């Protein structure tokens, strides 16, 4: 049976994530129905809008539920920021930052499992005006 990954989001917004997970052999559950998350082996928190203040209860519930049961969580862009805020970290807004037309592509350095999956210098896209300021203790 394929591993199930719960992709927290609205259908129609995350086709790239969906396609990548399915091509890697995962069965993806894309919805906001918390009960569907109970049978999933992993959680993907994708990118999205800004985080202003505490996280919505749904995201906090999902993070707590997956962390308590030691199921893997992957936060991408806003998703990583959500994990940081949830566990006590802070974000920094970059006032006046102008978002470019299109995504910026730049190389990164991967280690461990990510390097085995993606190579040592995968290119990533980014378009942010918020960033992690103080890293939450569980993420250090």
Where are these regions (language model features)?
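N-terminal beta1-alpha1 cap of cysteine-dependent amidohydrolase-like domains
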Residues: 1-74, 78, 85-92, 96-123, ...
